[in-house]
């Protein structure tokens, strides 16, 4: 079970929490589509800022968005000019007042989503997939990861037949619910087609009371 399922979804309510924090009965579908639009818009607009996670909270006529990014300076801009523009554009999507919080990801090497995007970027630049995987694994372990597994699927190295290759170092216990495992997925758009990149980073066990 732990091998197949999304590791974050598997741990929701145990050691992980939801990225969308709101409750709606009649408007559930509308809010869900709105969340998707917000996330797609922010990912596209702020791609160079290294977006790790976007949390959305809703209350009455207000929407609070927490953005976790590796380079928050690119989002804020000079004297906060970029944030104000962002607020206006998001208010147009949601038709509500929008508040934005920006949190810095201090160690991007330990963030699975950012590692996956980094590997995908290297593959797009025609760097050999084994080299890209090994480089990311080494830097994550250097910054304190207990274990990491990177999987690449697709026409690797321009091969006729698609295949899956993975590289792992350390422990990645997928069945242990108390294991703090971060998961990230990215796609590399190469001339041969799309290569999927999955990253699992084990950061240690969360013990009761922590």
From Swiss-Prot:
Indicate yes or no for the key word Calcium. no
One Pfam family in the UniProt entry:
KH_2
The protein's UniProt keywords, in alphabetical order, are:
Ribonucleoprotein, Ribosomal protein, RNA-binding, rRNA-binding
Q: Where are the transmembrane segments?
A: none
Q: Name one GO biological process term.
A: translation
Domain KH type-2, which positions? 38-106
In Gene Ontology terms, what is one molecular function of this protein? structural constituent of ribosome
Task: Please indicate if the UniProt record lists Endoplasmic reticulum as a keyword.
Answer: no
Q: Which GO terms describe its cellular component?
A: cytosolic small ribosomal subunit
Give the PANTHER family listed for this entry.
30S/40S RIBOSOMAL PROTEIN S3, SMALL RIBOSOMAL SUBUNIT PROTEIN US3C
Instruction: Tell me the function of this protein.
Output: Binds the lower part of the 30S subunit head. Binds mRNA in the 70S ribosome, positioning it for translation.
Regarding protein family, the annotation reads:
Belongs to the universal ribosomal protein uS3 family.
Quaternary structure (record): Part of the 30S ribosomal subunit. Forms a tight complex with proteins S10 and S14.
- Write the protein's name: Small ribosomal subunit protein uS3
According to its UniProt entry, this protein's organism is Trichlorobacter lovleyi (strain ATCC BAA-1151 / DSM 17278 / SZ) (Geobacter lovleyi)
């Amino acid at each position: 079970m732990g091998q197949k399922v999304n590791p974050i979804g598997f741990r929701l309510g145990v050691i992980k929490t939801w990225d969308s924090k709101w409750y709606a009965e009649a408007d559930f579908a509308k809010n869900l589509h709105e969340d998707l639009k917000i996330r797609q818009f922010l990912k596209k607009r702020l791609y160079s800022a290294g977006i790790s996670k976007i949390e959305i909270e809703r209350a009455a006529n207000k929407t609070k968005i927490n953005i976790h990014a590796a380079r928050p300076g690119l989002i804020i801009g000079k004297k906060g000019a970029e944030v104000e523009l962002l607020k206006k554009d998001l208010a147009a999507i949601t038709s509500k007042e929008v508040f934005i919080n920006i949190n810095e990801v201090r160690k991007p090497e330990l963030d699975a989503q950012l590692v996956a995007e980094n590997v995908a970027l290297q593959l797009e630049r025609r760097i050999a997939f084994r080299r890209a995987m090994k480089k990311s694994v080494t830097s994550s372990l250097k910054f304190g990861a207990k274990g990491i597994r990177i999987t690449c699927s697709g026409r690797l190295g321009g091969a006729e037949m698609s295949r899956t290759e993975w590289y792992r170092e350390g422990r990645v216990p997928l069945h242990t619910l108390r294991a703090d495992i971060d998961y990230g997925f990215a796609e590399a758009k190469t001339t041969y087609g799309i290569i999927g990149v999955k990253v699992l980073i084990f950061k240690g066990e969360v013990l009761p009371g922590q």
